[in-house]
Every structure is written in structure tokens, then in C-alpha cells.
């Protein structure tokens, strides 16, 4: 009897030790009820579990297909589960021999990452054109919003502690307005569910969203100047990337929209190469070249001394010319008040981003869906001849005279220019005060709002033709 008792005691202790050391299945916060998984792909799923055990994954859109993954010695596992065309609601089961996690109300559709600073973070509660109507109209059960809390970290994090919400008026009014309008226009056009993952923090520089080693490896980024100018925000290199972006990059999403740049205006000269480096670093970590579309910063009375805002806009255009799978949305005409750095007319910004995506990535829109950008400048007699992209159907001025165009001679002194639109949709720029023209610029300052558009209604992007 005593031997049996000792044997039972021994076995119970073994069982207790096993139970105490067992690690149940766990998933990062982006895998949760109400989520959207990217459709028609192999979607990455990962998490934690008991070392050396087998984890099985079953999506109810394909219940007969079970995906297996082995937990490594560090307690981590990762798998890819095939997804079908858009639909739902579905469930996703993740389990081993002991524990199970069941995610409910999952939709298959298109997923986009939305990031940047305050104009991306800006909610209807902060201010929005036609706010009450837009909020009341925001009952969209097939739009889901993943909110990433604003947190910084000096080390890479595995989770961002975010939350998925179904889009309701109550949710919409406290989430990114641009992300919502972008998602809504995508949903209406593609007729599929859309998930947007919003990781944004007002007042932050691009350096904070870039991996630390990228910033530290290039002395030209000169982060110390930003830290001196704006000491009250999380300005250190990589701290927002570590906590708010890095955990999301393994997730399978369609692409990224980005609205940032205002905080970098005091150090604009290396912003282009910084952004290019940031985009490439995100893509390397994700293991794929996902599309990346920017919003050009809006006109605002910065009262800058070194033309920093104009140089940021120029750098944003440079990024699109030198980085594959990128695009740029110009929103100068969406500004109602140049004394506010946060324009409240967010609907057209979201729609323009969506139209660019629909045309360039999904290829479901024909025609022109982006702003004209300067392609070429030639000198002919006493005039400059300017050629633009995206003006095949015409370039127009919405007023009697074109605003914001200036011309200079060899002395580099700019004066107001006269402009004629010729039959080739080129601009002829001249001034009786400039006998030998060498350069022109258009809205190349803090806050001038131009009035040149292509026939499709997109504003001509600000530019300069020569650097003095």
C-alpha cells in the first residue's frame, strides 16, 4: 500500500511539473475576433506555444485543410494558411493537444497598413468637414479597423497590443479619418471587406519610424537636431518602428499608405533618402516589396526660413521617382485654411489614395488618377517650356490667371511669371522682367495654393526647375 501511495505521489508531482511548464497556444493581438485576413493568398499566422509541440490551424473557409507548424525551442511557431476569395464571417482555430484558440467573425478581404504622424492619426473627433453626416453614415460592418496604441520602445517588440473593431459610428469618430475614407472607397469599388491597421503618432519624425541601425549608419540624418527642436515627442531613432511597426510586418497585408513629413521640415535635405531607406527596411523585414503610397504635406503657414516644407514636398516626389512600387497624392486643393496644419477635409485625401491604389495596384480603374508632375523644362527664346505627366487630356487653370508661378534669370531672382497653355498641354512661362530665363518654380514655398489642374481634377504638384 505504501509503495502504491509513493508511486501515485511521484506521478502526481511529475504531472504538476509538466502542467506548470506547459505553454498554452497564444497569438499576437492582430489575430483576434473581427479581424480581416488578406484574401487569395497564403496568409502568415504565428504565435507562441509549448516547445517541440505541433500546432494545427484550421480556417472555416477551408475546413478540410489543416495547416501544421512545429513550435521551436524558443516557444515560437509560424505558418502560412491559404485564403480564398473575399467573404465571411469565418472562424480560425489554432490548437495543439491541450489548448485551443478560436477566433470568430473573421473576414477575408483587402488589408492595408496606414501610418505616419498627426494627419494620419487625425480623427473626426478632432475635426472633420461635414462631421455629423460622415459619422452617422459610418455603419460599415465589412470595414474593420485595427488600432495600434501609441507606444515607443528601445528594443524590437513581438506584439503591439492592438485591437480590431467593427466600423460603427462610435468607432469611426475616434479612429483615423483618412484610413476610414480610404477603406470605404476601396470597399465600395472592389466590393470586398477591407481592414486597415492604423499605426500613427502626431508630431513624430520619420527617424522614429525607421529601424535604429538605418538612422545610425548615416550621419547625414542628423537626428540630434530634431531632438533639440522637439524634445517632448518620442524622437529617438527606431523607437516607434520597434513597437508600432515591427510587430505588424510579418502580417500579410496588401500595401501601405503614409502621411508624414511635417516634423522633418527643419532637416529636409536628407528626407528623401531617409524615406527611401525606411521603405526598403520595412520591405526587407516583411520579405516582400509591398506598395507604398505617400500623401504630400499640405500648404500651411509654417513661417519657415529655409523653405523646409517645400523641400519636404520635393523629397516626397523624389522618393516616388527612385523607389519602386510607390506613389504620391497631392492635396493642396483640399486645404480650406492655411493657418491650420491639420486640414479637416479628409474625405478627398482618402479617396485619392484609394483611387491611386485602385489604378496602380488593383488595375481596376482606367485613365488618369494622379496629379501632374513636372517632366521636362526647356528654354526657347525668352520662354521656358514646361512638360508634365498625366496631362494627356488637358491642363487647365480654374481662374483667370495662374497663381504661384515664378521665373528667374541667371541672377536667381524670382519674379511673378506669365503663363500660357499651348496646344500640347505644355506651359509657356515668361516675364518681361526676365530677358534670359533659366528657372521657374510653382507653389514652391510654405503655403501657396495653386490653381493648375489636369482635366481629371488633380492639382499640379509644386516644383522648381533649377537649384541655385
Predicted feature locations:
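Cell-envelope and extracellular/periplasmic
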Residues: 20-468
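Bacterial Sec-dependent N-terminal signal peptides
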Residues: 1-22
Amino acid at each position: 500500500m505504501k509503495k502504491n501511495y509513493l508511486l501515485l505521489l511521484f506521478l502526481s508531482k511529475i504531472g504538476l511539473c509538466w502542467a506548470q511548464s506547459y505553454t498554452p497556444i497564444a497569438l499576437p493581438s492582430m489575430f483576434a475576433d473581427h479581424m480581416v485576413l488578406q484574401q487569395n493568398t497564403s496568409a502568415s499566422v504565428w504565435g507562441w506555444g509549448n516547445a517541440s509541440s505541433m500546432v494545427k490551424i484550421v480556417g472555416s473557409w477551408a475546413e478540410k485543410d489543416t495547416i501544421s507548424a512545429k513550435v521551436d525551442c524558443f516557444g515560437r511557431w509560424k505558418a502560412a494558411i491559404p485564403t480564398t476569395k473575399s467573404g465571411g464571417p469565418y472562424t480560425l482555430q489554432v490548437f495543439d493537444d491541450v489548448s485551443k484558440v478560436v477566433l470568430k467573425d473573421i473576414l477575408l478581404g483587402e488589408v492595408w497598413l496606414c501610418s505616419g504622424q498627426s494627419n494620419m492619426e487625425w480623427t473626426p473627433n478632432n475635426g472633420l468637414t461635414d462631421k455629423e453626416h460622415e459619422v452617422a453614415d459610418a455603419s460599415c460592418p465589412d470595414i474593420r479597423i485595427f488600432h495600434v496604441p501609441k507606444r515607443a520602445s528601445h528594443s524590437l517588440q513581438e506584439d503591439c497590443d492592438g485591437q480590431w473593431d467593427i466600423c460603427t459610428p462610435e468607432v469611426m469618430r475616434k479612429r483615423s479619418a483618412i484610413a476610414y475614407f480610404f477603406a470605404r472607397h476601396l470597399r465600395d469599388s472592389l466590393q470586398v471587406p477591407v481592414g486597415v491597421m492604423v499605426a500613427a503618432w502626431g508630431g513624430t519624425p520619420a527617424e522614429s519610424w525607421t529601424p535604429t541601425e538605418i538612422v545610425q549608419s548615416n550621419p547625414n540624418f542628423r537626428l540630434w537636431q530634431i531632438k533639440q527642436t522637439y524634445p517632448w515627442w518620442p524622437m529617438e531613432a527606431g523607437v516607434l518602428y520597434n513597437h508600432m511597426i515591427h510587430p505588424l510586418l510579418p502580417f500579410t497585408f496588401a500595401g501601405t499608405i503614409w502621411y508624414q513629413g511635417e516634423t522633418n521640415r527643419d532637416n529636409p535635405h536628407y528626407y528623401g533618402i531617409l524615406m527611401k531607406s525606411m521603405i526598403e527596411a520595412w520591405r526587407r523585414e516583411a520579405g516582400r516589396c509591398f506598395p507604398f503610397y505617400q500623401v504630400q504635406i499640405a500648404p500651411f503657414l509654417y513661417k519657415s526660413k529655409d523653405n523646409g516644407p517645400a523641400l519636404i514636398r520635393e523629397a516626397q516626389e523624389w522618393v516616388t521617382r527612385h523607389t519602386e512600387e510607390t506613389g504620391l497624392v497631392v492635396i493642396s486643393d483640399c486645404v480650406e485654411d492655411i493657418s491650420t496644419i491639420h486640414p479637416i477635409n479628409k474625405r478627398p485625401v482618402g479617396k485619392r489614395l484609394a483611387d491611386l491604389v485602385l489604378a496602380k495596384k488593383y488595375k481596376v480603374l482606367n485613365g488618369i488618377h494622379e496629379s501632374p508632375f513636372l517632366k521636362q523644362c526647356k528654354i526657347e527664346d525668352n520662354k521656358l517650356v514646361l512638360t508634365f505627366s498625366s496631362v494627356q487630356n488637358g491642363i487647365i487653370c480654374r481662374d483667370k490667371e495662374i497663381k504661384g508661378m515664378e521665373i528667374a534669370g541667371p541672377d536667381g531672382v524670382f519674379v511673378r511669371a506669365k503663363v500660357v497653355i499651348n496646344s500640347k498641354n505644355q506651359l509657356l512661362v515668361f516675364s518681361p522682367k526676365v530677358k534670359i530665363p533659366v528657372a521657374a518654380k510653382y507653389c514652391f514655398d510654405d503655403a501657396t495654393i495653386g490653381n493648375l489642374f489636369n482635366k481629371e481634377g488633380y492639382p499640379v504638384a509644386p516644383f522648381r526647375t533649377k537649384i541655385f
